[in-house]
Amino acid sequence: MKNMISRRNFLAAAGVVAAAGVLTACGGSSSTAASTAAASGSTAAAASGDTIKVGVMGPLSGNVSVYGQAVVNGATLYLKQVNANGGINGKQIEILTEDEQGDATQAVNCFTKMVDEGMTALIGDVTTTPTLAVVAESADYNMPMVTASATAEAVTYDAETDTVNENVFRATFTDPFQGIKMADYAYQRLGYTKAAVIFKKGADYNEGLAENFVNEFESLGGTIVDQESYSEGDVDFKTQLTTILGKDPETVFCPNYYEEVGQILSQAESVGLTVPFLGGDGWDGLEGYASNDQL
């Protein structure tokens, strides 16, 4: 039988987790020391007497590790400051850290492990698909959790049942907001009337931004001249980019994560597609995967 968290403990844990999530959302890049500590699996803050166990989870390795490391670093910094100032109601926070490697199944496994270790609240997950998997699992425990970066609307709201996920908090914007605002910027501010889109199919984040960009751009009077997709694991995008080139867009919306975006920008240049590319928050970290001339 799953242990439900009491309302009193829920509110106390949710408060500190929400504060840590806000700090994390404003955080920057990772440090080697913090990454090394996180990779060990569990980092316990100096504790005296009773402790409150808070889980911190993200992709500390893999293709989107820059995001996971930033979340762990920001959350750990804040929680250590809470401990230094006396903790919560005299109790110190013990930080449980897990690397879900950017994988939804692994994320659920990490969540379950931390629950078994006595976690009372979670900071995480980080990217959209793993977060959605953890959200579904966390509801059974009434586990307070806050994500600093997962942008799918379904993280906090179930459209099929028209219900809010009451145990889940978000310290960032949503996919509809990003997609709509970028379409507004492209059409109204930059003056583009013809756009193409390239995105990863089957990925909640990528498809969510693409759909909202397309709908808004067309509603403003713009034309989507082409929509190209690719699959998980693809590294050659020249076919899609050549097709886009033939449709003569003024811009390309590329709502993907930084590593793939870097490859796409490089290959676009090689096929002669030199129009401006636009994207979402998944481009954070792109500097290490694209040249200054491409940015």
Regions found by a protein language model. Name each.
Residues 64-89, 211-216:
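Short, polar/charged alpha-helical segment
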Residues 119-227, 276-294:
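Extracytoplasmic ligand/sensor domains, especially the bilobed periplasmic-binding protein
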Residues 1-25:
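N-terminal secretory signal peptides
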Residues 48, 55-74, 98-104, 126-127, ...:
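Extracytoplasmic "Venus flytrap"
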Residues 128-139, 235-238, 242, 247-271:
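Hydrophobic alpha-helical
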Residues 34-58, 87-92, 187-193:
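Immediate post-signal peptide segment of exported/extracytoplasmic ligand-binding proteins
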Residues 66-71, 85-158, 230-235, 262:
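Beta-alpha junction/loop-to-helix N-cap segments that form part of ligand/metal-binding clefts
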Residues 26-36:
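Bacterial lipoprotein signal-peptidase II cleavage site
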